Amino acid sequence: MLRVLRSIHIGVANRGVWPLTLCTPQRGFRPVALVDISQQALQEARARVGLPESACFNDAQQALEQVQADCVIICAPTRFHLPLTKLALSKRLPVLVEKGMAPDFASAVEFVRAVEQAGVPVCIAQNYRYGPMERTILSCISDPSHPAHTGFVYCMDYVQHRVRPEPRTLTYPFASVWDMSCHHFDNLLAWFGPAEWMQAASFAAPWSAYPHDNNTSAIIRMANGTTVNYCHTHDASRGQLVVSLHGQRGALWLNDAGEIHFSQRPTEQFGTRPAQVVPRVEAPGQAGVLADFYRYVTEGVEPGISARNNLQVMAMCEMMVRAITTGRRVYRREIDQQGESRT
């Protein structure tokens, strides 16, 4: 019989909606308390999961003290992730935290240190890696028997333009890096392994409402030899995702319709080869985040989204921040040395 974990949900609006929708007994979860500063958000969450008003709180500590639970799911703004996680860890409760782990690398190191000291499972909800596009690309890169196997990828273009004119909670320095680039970097780590170095720049549109630069570009050299041309914007005039890989065996790319295509690498000057559509693999999406968190809590199987593993993502974010602020190439080994000095 499936063990059902009683979950306290801190932050139930916006990104806090998906866990409430997916946390069902069939998946091993049952919400028992809701925490939010917004009464409207609490009312909507209550209606979604069928909890009484007595299960709603405006204060996380009060909820943790009054409600018996088996885990905590935190979907508050990034700057609150560390203190809220520490609060849950003080009750020795496993935690699932929305991405990004923290608003800066020092906080991320402190976050992981607190998790290790508590000795309880903590995961970061990096849901992109559970998507069909991401899983299909991983298969094409890593499986030599795949019909669309790329071989070694020497170059990749990875661009996401986002129409996000309202800053909302993204008002702190490099918020777009810690909040959104963390997804892209998590994908790169899954596809190619760790990064070796990064050069980067930040910029803003004349019409931007953000107090800090919220657009970034970078050249990233992965340790396996792949070079990534990366760009991410929030001031875009049109939403667009560009994913294009050039491998020894062929090219893999995403078209505007969201289809993944593959063509073999020509060997003649200015040659071309016919493109074929690559079927997407089945992927769990956000349900996969919950499944891996559940397995970590109940079986002790550490997933790629554990806090310890996610520190690798935060290290890439720190590489970008440091490359932008110093105007130089930043090597991963520098970040490792900084992390070691803080532990």
PLM-predicted stretches and their roles:
Residues M1, C71-I73, Y294-T343:
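C-terminal helix-rich "cap/oligomerization" subdomain common to oxidoreductases
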Residues M1-L51:
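N-terminal Rossmann-like dinucleotide-binding module
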Residues P19, A55-A114:
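Beta-loop-alpha module in the N-terminal Rossmann-like domain of NAD(P)-dependent dehydrogenases
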Residues I37, V277-A291, I305:
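Active-site loop of classical SDR/Rossmann-like NAD(P)-dependent oxidoreductases
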Residues V97-E98, V122-I124, L254:
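Hydrophobic residues in well-ordered beta-strands that form the structural core
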Residues E110-N127, S145-V153:
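Rossmann-fold dehydrogenase core element
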Residues Y128-A209, G327:
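Predominantly a Rossmann-like dinucleotide-binding segment in NAD(P)-dependent oxidoreductases
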Residues F185-E259, A287-V301, D336-T343:
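Contiguous beta-strand/loop segments that form the cofactor/metal-binding neighborhood of enzyme cores
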